[in-house]
């Protein structure tokens, strides 16, 4: 009705009628009414409950079924919530943080975190309250399916909540029975929890997980890169182990390592790491088969050629093989990176590369 004739609905007092329906004893009616009001009032910033209505819903929601409970909680937060109402909500709903249904717990946690965002003392208390709750769920063998949703939420949680989880870092070490989604979410979050004292343990744990599916492998290498670049004392250890993986089974790991090698910022190595980095690059290039490489891995190859061509035996041969590839589907970035890498090789080996450089320039002049 609203979408067809909004003006008529306003004239007939639809909004007022819907607000009165929020006192209906049936939870499903209340849920659908909230949703409808939110759509109708979208242009005005959506539904905003006054204190009286929020208190009424709070008194009723504690007896709702899980689905309606979670739905109504999404509407209990408002910029207009004062401290008295905030405390009322916190006190009334606190027991639901211990609810066995993860969706109920997470709905309450999300609401609480919004409510106390600008109240320092309440926020400190809430951090202490929700941390063991989150840890308990993540440690549970019966919550594996739900834990993906919890992990998704805490990926973007504020830093003080993350800090409180640092002492529980092992909870984020993936378990064999975890689903692939949960494994990836845990691995992606691990770098946020790592400090110097736990970095090496986290790195070794992730390395020992391998091999996994390609998605998990890439998540591992991306998180290793984040840890190795933030905790410099672990950088060499990470690079050496990546090289060992390539030497052990380059077919299994080359593409996955190439997908993440730029994240390791190996062009910014220190003098003490020089030998290990160069050996790592040589091992990558020795394992490389240009004819079978995925197009998405080429940017990493260009990166290595541009920064390490002086360490790669006959780099012009790699350039030549790449130029023989079908480039019809390449994005502009690939062409520019190929030109940049070829130029670096040309500066190093002008006699061996001048014909290739000329062909490339002619190709791009006619594109």
Show which residues each predicted segment covers.
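Extended alpha-solenoid helical-repeat scaffolds
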Residues: 1-367
């Amino acid at each position: 009705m609203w979408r067809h004739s909004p003006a008529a609905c306003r004239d007939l007092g639809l909004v007022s009628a819907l607000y009165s329906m929020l006192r209906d004893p049936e939870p499903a009616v209340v849920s659908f009414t909230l949703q409808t009001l939110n759509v109708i009032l979208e242009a005005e910033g959506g539904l905003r409950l006054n204190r009286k209505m929020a208190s009424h819903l709070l008194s009723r929601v504690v007896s709702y079924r899980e689905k309606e409970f979670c739905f109504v909680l999404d509407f209990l937060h408002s910029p207009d919530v004062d401290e008295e109402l905030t405390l009322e909500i916190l006190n009334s709903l606190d027991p639901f943080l211990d609810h066995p249904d993860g969706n109920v717990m997470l709905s309450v946690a999300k609401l609480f975190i919004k409510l106390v965002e600008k109240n320092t003392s309440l926020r400190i208390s809430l951090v202490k309250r929700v941390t063991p709750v989150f840890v308990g769920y993540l440690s549970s063998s019966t919550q594996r399916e739900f834990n993906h949703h919890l992990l998704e939420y805490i990926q973007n949680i504020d830093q003080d909540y993350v800090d409180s989880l640092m002492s529980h870092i092992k909870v984020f070490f993936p378990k064999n029975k975890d689903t692939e989604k949960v494994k990836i979410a845990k691995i992606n979050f691990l770098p946020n929890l790592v400090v110097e004292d736990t970095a090496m343990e986290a790195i070794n744990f992730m390395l020992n997980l391998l091999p996994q599916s390609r998605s998990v492998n890439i998540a591992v290498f991306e998180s290793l890169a984040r840890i190795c670049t933030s905790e410099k004392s672990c950088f060499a250890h990470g690079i050496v182990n990546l090289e060992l993986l390539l030497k052990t089974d380059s077919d299994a790991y080359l593409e996955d390592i190439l997908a993440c090698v730029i994240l390791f910022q190996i062009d910014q190595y220190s003098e003490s790491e020089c030998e290990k980095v160069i050996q790592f690059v040589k091992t990558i290039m020795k394992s490389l088969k240009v004819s079978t490489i995925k197009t998405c891995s080429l940017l990493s190859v260009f990166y290595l050629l541009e920064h390490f061509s002086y360490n790669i035996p006959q780099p012009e041969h790699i350039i030549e093989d790449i130029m023989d590839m079908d480039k019809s589907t390449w994005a502009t970035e690939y062409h520019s990176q190929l030109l940049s890498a070829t130029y670096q090789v040309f500066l190093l080996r002008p006699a061996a590369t001048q014909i290739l450089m000329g062909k490339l320039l002619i190709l791009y002049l006619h594109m």
